[in-house]
Amino acid sequence: MDLKDEFIQIIKKYSELSLKESENETKKYIQEVFNVSLSEVFIKEPSKQETLKQEPTQETNGCIYIFKKGKNIGQKCGSGKSKFCYKHKKNDLNIKVNQERNIKKPIPKPIPTNKIETGSVINQNWFIGTSIGKGGFGEIYSAAKFNDHGNYKDDDFSFAIKIEPKSNGPLFVEMHFYKRVIVEKEIEKFKLQKNIQYLGLPKYYGSGLYNDYRYIVMEKYDSNIDKLFRNGDLNSSTILQIGIQILNIVEYIHSKGYIHADIKGENILLKENDTSHIYLVDFGLCSRYSNIYQPDPKKAHNGTLKYTSRDSHQGVESRRGDLEILGYNMIEWSGGILPWQHLCKKSAGKKILNEVSESKIKYMNDLSLFFNKVQFNDTNLKNKLQTYFETIIKITFEELPPYQLLHNIFN
């Protein structure tokens, strides 16, 4: 896909949102999509005298110029061959981008050990407690909230604060996902429509910048499904119960136009090992859903390799892909060994990535072979999961998944 086609696809996905937001929010949307810093994004209202031959006043390589309600703006503008504008007819939104935006930026450095110390105070709101988890770039701490009098309760570290370098993209994406999707009013409306009492999405308490770091604050949990699995604490009934809850969550996320793309045991949290109320977290790989199937090599193989969907291996995020990822997890929780599992190493190169992708394609094209290869202790659970996979592999890319039918299979 050349730059123009990619550009048009992205603008079609984002233009409706962009015009509903303030200028700063529009900049953030574009920053998220094109992976540039906010200083590289400019929004201006072109005057009636502006023509295609005139350059915007800002002259910076790798910039994106956004024109709202512009006139005389065509699909190519400026003197540079790699520069062009695209006008989205529905919302009259015009954006200009330089091909030089594809210059690779340095990978942000992880937070050094003990850089954020216990006892630190973030923006006069949050008191940092002990570290409760560490990832590739950031760290998660317990936290207490200051009240209006500047005090906090010593025994109330019921919050979790996730901190990463502010140049790291996933936490930026996650922060905006929380703001746009985890909205209590919308969640309550969905629960009412679906006649369910509970939807496993974490409570969001705020986010912001702290020195050279970005942070997000959410509810703190006690454990995750991966730990229960490794301890042998997942039986067939519990696995099906978790599957039903995840189906509810992804249906809601999909209804808001997003794909999760990284469902796995480590990202499914719970309190006091209560599997009747699980919470799906980590939205750093979330992306907006597009009904155009357009593989993107830059996004190919995103996610956790063992569970990545066939679409994700091609650089396309899809609703059916989330369901496929869930199915792979449920097989593993059931004690099954995925046929490509031995290939999934932390430092997998391109050859291994392609081998895993090809293995999934092979087995999804022959489910009988797949389920003969995977070992199950529970025949009833195996039959349910086989029916589940037989259903989801028939879903076309653009098709809305039959969530209720999948519920019925697990019930």
Swiss-Prot record:
Residues 126-410 form the Protein kinase domain. The keyword Transferase applies. ATP binds at I132, G133, K134, G135, G136, F137, G138, E139, I140, K162. The active site is at D262 (proton acceptor). It comes from the Viruses. GO terms for molecular function: ATP binding; protein serine kinase activity; protein serine/threonine kinase activity. Its EC number is 2.7.11.1. Keywords: ATP-binding, Kinase, Nucleotide-binding, Serine/threonine-protein kinase, Transferase. Signal peptide: none annotated. It holds the Pfam family Pkinase. Belongs to the protein kinase superfamily. Ser/Thr protein kinase family. This is Probable serine/threonine-protein kinase 389L.
